[in-house]
Amino acid sequence: MISKYRNAGIAALLAGASFAAIVAQDAALHVASGQREILLQTSQSWNGKPYRHYPAGQPQLTTIKLTIGPHTALPWHTHPFPNVVYVLSGTLTLHDKASGKTLVVHQGQAVGESVDDVHRGETGDETTVLLITYAGTPGVPTSIPAKGEQAEY
């Protein structure tokens, strides 16, 4: 009988010690707000066309990391919904096929890509790494090749 009470006492002691450790750990945390830097806030794509709508249906965010070798042109393509490109490293030159507009985006910069306009990106002398976030919906591809072109990725 004494053994039963001793085991219960040990269990209670361990539970109390665990709780005390959790409380001490939380007390050691410094609570503070982070510093915000808006990288991109826009209602239009880089080529000047306004975003008109989001796709209907269940929203689905998709973020990809795209690595493109030096001196590479991606195939011509479109996107069916808004997305944001952030250049982690390298340089990306965007080309709008219909208008001929171009935009050079450097490491640390973000840009809103065009929706339904045929475009592509080209890299410079070094590998370019992009972080791309799409505001889409399930079942709809994030990139659609232009007629006669291969997939962007």
Language model feature labels by segment:
Residues 2-7, 17-60, 104, 146-153:
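A short, N-terminal "cap"/entry segment at the start of jelly-roll beta-barrel domains
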Residues 56-59, 71-84:
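A short beta-loop-beta micro-motif enriched in histidine and acidic residues
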Residues 68, 99-116:
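Short acidic-glycine-tyrosine-enriched beta hairpin
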Residues 73-75, 110-121:
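Histidine-centered metal-chelating micro-motifs
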Residues 74-79, 96, 103, 121-123:
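Short histidine-centered beta-strand/loop micro-motifs
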Residues 79-98:
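Glycine- and acidic-residue-biased ligand/ion/polar-headgroup-sensing regions
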Residues 115-141:
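Ligand-binding loop in jelly-roll beta-barrel domains
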